[in-house]
C-alpha cells in the first residue's frame, strides 16, 4: 500500500521495518525497542526509538499508524491489555494491529505438564522472559476486551515429533469428551 505508516513495538534492529520500507518505498516506518544498544543500531537507519512500551510516553501523534506490529511482544508484558489500550489512540480508525503470540496449549507443553514437567527455556513457548501465556481463545478475548475485533487469524504448526510416551499421553487426552480440537494442540504460534 502506498504511503502506509507502520509502528513496530519490539522491533529489534528494525529488520521487519526495513523489509517493509524496501517492499513499499512510500511507507513510513517507525519502531520502539526496549534494548538500548539494539535500538541505537537500528536508529542509524530507521526511525527507531528506545523505550519500554509499558512505561514510556509514546513519541508519536495520535491517529498516525495504519498498522501496529506486536510480533512476539504481548507475552513479555505485565499487562498486555493495558498496552493495547495505550496503543489504540495511535492507530488510524481503519488501522490494524498485527500480532503473534505462542500457543501454551501446544502438545509439547501439555505432554510435559501431564508428566509433571515444567521447564523454562532460553527460547520458544516457555521462554524464561514470558510473563503471559495464551491460547487461541484467550488471545481473541484479550482483543475483544480492548474493543477490537479479530478479523483474521493464522497459525504456525509444530512439526517436531513427540516421543512415544508423550504421543501415548496425547492420544489418551484426545479421547476425553469436550477437549479442545486436536489441531489446536499442534499450533506453535498464532498470528
Q: PLM features: residue spans?
A:
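A short beta-strand submotif of the Rossmann-like class I SAM-dependent methyltransferase core
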Residues: 67-73
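S-adenosyl-L-methionine-dependent methyltransferase catalytic module, highlighting the catalytic core
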Residues: 15, 19, 67, 78-191
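Class I SAM-dependent methyltransferase SAM/SAH-binding core
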Residues: 15, 19-56
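A short acidic, Gly/Pro-enriched loop at the edge of an enzyme's catalytic core
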Residues: 58-67
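A short, aliphatic-rich alpha-helical micro-motif
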Residues: 42-43, 62, 84
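Residues at the starts of beta-strands that form the adenosine-phosphate
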Residues: 5, 28, 149
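Conserved class I S-adenosyl-L-methionine
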Residues: 3-12
